[in-house]
Regions:
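Rossmann-fold dinucleotide-binding core
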Residues: 115-184, 192-193
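Amphipathic alpha-helical segments at domain termini/boundaries
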Residues: 7, 25, 68-87, 168, ...
Length: 296
């Protein structure tokens, strides 16, 4: 594995924040980038609270926590963060053009050696890599929420990703305590294609009156031993995220299993983007819209 000293994480939302925390706890210097100081301040508080919980559970010492926090630089300056990074992990919203614009800019800023990893959950890696002049050093590194807890990293090669780049990300994932598993490039890869199809079908069954939201969640949790039901999971991930992923996969594949349900579109248009604890500014998710008490 090439020497890795500095990682730039672009996007300080829930995923980017979690990724930055894991990398810092793994001993790497991290620059966490976003467009506003307010977002970065929230990220800083979230990381500290997460590490404090880890200390309480005996996962790390207080001294280790302070050292890890000291490895993270929070900045709105993309060029400053990325120009000497050995690895850039992108974790901005799931929008093809937005991501391509970012990678085109990063391609101009970063040295040739820098590897680009995208945390996209659905967009094709080969398509994103086409915005750069380094498709051999471009790869999908799909983390799961919450990043400090979830073990899986889905690793996706683009059509031109080199073996060296693939092996680098696999070894890094292991060093960070994760389990890397390879999936092939395609809309939604494996994990996202699988889970959004399940969520869409649960929503359609609710629309058809087969069972209520709470009842569906209870049956899935008790019958299949899932930690969250499909509506709880949808609210946790974000209804807007699920809608856009379904729309993308449906448009790319034509498979009706991925056609976004009408009620999902209505909620997103009305500002119900998911659980407000996970989606600041959201009116709520399925549970709030249909006035169902949440289990706390």
């Amino acid at each position: 594995m090439e020497e890795l000293k500095k990682i730039a994480v672009i996007g300080a939302g829930i995923m980017g924040t979690g990724i930055a925390e894991v990398c810092a706890r793994g001993g790497y210097d991290v620059a966490l980038v976003d467009i506003s100081e307010e977002i970065l301040q929230r990220a800083k508080e979230r990381i500290r609270k997460s590490m404090e919980r880890a200390v309480e559970r005996g996962k790390m010492s207080k001294e280790e926590m302070e050292k890890a926090l000291g490895r993270i630089k929070f900045t709105t300056n993309l060029e400053e963060a990325a120009r000497d990074a050995d690895l850039v992990i992108e974790a901005i919203p799931e929008n093809m053009e937005l991501k391509k614009q970012l990678f085109k800019r990063l391609d101009e800023i970063c040295p040739e050696r820098t590897i680009f990893a995208t945390n996209t959950s659905s967009l094709m890696i080969t398509d994103l890599a086409s915005a750069t002049k380094r498709p051999d050093r471009f790869i999908g590194m799909h983390w799961f929420n919450p990043a400090p807890v979830m073990k899986l990293i889905e690793v996706i090669r683009g059509a031109l990703t080199s073996d060296d780049t693939f092996n680098f990300i696999v070894e890094l994932s292991k060093k960070l305590g994760k389990v890397p598993v390879e999936a092939q490039d395609g809309p939604g890869f494996f994990t996202t294609r699988f889970i959004v199809a399940v969520l869409a079908e649960a929503i359609r069954l609710f629309e058809q009156g087969i069972a209520g939201i709470k009842e569906i969640d209870t049956m899935v949790k008790l019958g299949f031993n899932w930690p969250m039901g499909p509506f709880e999971l949808a609210d946790f991930v974000g209804l807007d995220t699920i809608y856009h992923v379904l729309e993308y996969v449906y448009n790319e594949t034509g498979n009706p299993a991925y056609k976004p349900p009408l009620i999902l579109r209505k909620l997103v248009l009305a500002g119900y983007l998911g659980d407000p604890r996970q989606k600041p500014g959201s009116r709520g998710g399925f549970y709030e819209y249909f006035k169902i008490p949440r289990e706390r």
